[in-house]
Swiss-Prot record:
Its main location: cytoplasm. One of its GO terms (biological process) is red, far-red light phototransduction. Probable protease subunit of the COP9 signalosome complex (CSN), a complex involved in various cellular and developmental processes such as photomorphogenesis and auxin and jasmonate responses. The CSN complex is an essential regulator of the ubiquitin (Ubl) conjugation pathway by mediating the deneddylation of the cullin subunits of the SCF-type E3 ligase complexes, leading to decrease the Ubl ligase activity of SCF. In the complex, it probably acts as the catalytic center that mediates the cleavage of Nedd8 from cullins. This is COP9 signalosome complex subunit 5a. Keywords: Cytoplasm, Developmental protein, Hydrolase, Metal-binding, Metalloprotease, Nucleus, Phytochrome signaling pathway, Protease, Signalosome. It is found in: Cytoplasm; Nucleus. The keyword Protease applies. It comes from Brassica oleracea (Wild cabbage). GO terms for molecular function: metal ion binding; metallopeptidase activity. Component of the CSN complex, probably composed of CSN1, CSN2, CSN3, CSN4, CSN5 (CSN5A or CSN5B), CSN6 (CSN6A or CSN6B), CSN7 and CSN8. GO terms for cellular component: COP9 signalosome; cytoplasm. It comes from the Eukaryota. Belongs to the peptidase M67A family. CSN5 subfamily.
């Protein structure tokens, strides 16, 4: 299965989660407040 890594930006950056999919070489930004 695809390996998905999740990273959280610093508080200085806008709130969001970066999803990086190595298989698709795509980066999606989700503006979800945790």
């Amino acid at each position: 299965k695809n390996i998905l890594t999740v990273e959280q930006p610093d508080s200085s950056s806008s709130d969001g989660i970066f999803y990086y999919d190595e298989a698709s070489k795509r980066v999606q930004i989700s503006a979800l407040a945790l």
